[in-house]
């Protein structure tokens, strides 16, 4: 019997793509030698990736140092923007979390940057439903390893992972 629910964030609880694209456009405007325009489809294809893998996918023609510089700058700006403005929660997310939290312990594990889950909480006031969180931006580990950290740290048994990608599906089995 499942007693614990681990959630992915992007694509599962909210869709932040529009706000993220807005922020990235602003940041990239400071780099006149970079003519890349980040589209919603680009962002969608990067959801669930760690920051280094997303950088390689978005900016394959740039050296790794510049990729990471851009990723860090954009991610930092994202956290500020999304914390202040929020983004689109999926339908009935809060009602669902409220109902589930009465019976199950809820957690978020994401491949996002440090601060991203907190900006989600800040904007939407949903932290009250979650027991703990973890992300690759804090640990430097992939989602499967962060699932293990959450499970061990909270002495959990019988978790289920709710996500929207194949990577989410396999991350609990690692």
Where are these regions (language model features)?
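Substrate-recognition "cap/lid" segment bordering the active-site pocket of phosphatases
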Residues: 114-160, 166-173
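Short hydrophobic faces within alpha-helices
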Residues: 11, 100, 171-172
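Short, acidic loop-to-helix structural element flanking the phosphoryl-transfer center
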Residues: 80-108, 118, 144
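Acidic di-acidic motifs
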Residues: 16, 163-164
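N-terminal helical cap/lid subdomain that shapes the substrate entry/recognition surface
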Residues: 2-91
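Conserved phosphate-coupling serine/threonine residues in phosphotransfer and NTP-handling enzymes
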Residues: 12, 110-112
């Amino acid at each position: 019997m499942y007693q614990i629910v681990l959630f992915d964030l992007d694509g599962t609880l909210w869709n932040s793509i529009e706000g993220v694209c807005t922020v990235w456009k602003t940041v990239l405007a400071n780099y006149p030698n970079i003519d890349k325009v980040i589209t919603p489809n680009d962002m969608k294809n990067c959801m669930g990736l760690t920051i280094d893998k997303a950088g390689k996918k978005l900016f394959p023609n740039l050296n790794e140092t510049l990729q990471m510089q851009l990723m860090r700058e954009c991610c930092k700006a994202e956290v500020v923007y999304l914390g202040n403005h929020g983004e689109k929660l999926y339908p009935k997310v809060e009602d669902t979390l409220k109902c589930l939290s009465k019976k199950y312990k809820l957690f978020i594990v994401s491949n996002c940057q440090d601060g991203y889950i907190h900006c989600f909480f800040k904007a939407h006031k949903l932290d009250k439903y979650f027991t703990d969180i973890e992300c690759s931006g804090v640990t430097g580990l992939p989602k499967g390893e962060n699932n293990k950290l959450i499970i061990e740290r909270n002495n959990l048994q019988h978790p289920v992972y709710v996500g929207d990608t194949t990577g989410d599906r396999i991350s609990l089995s690692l």
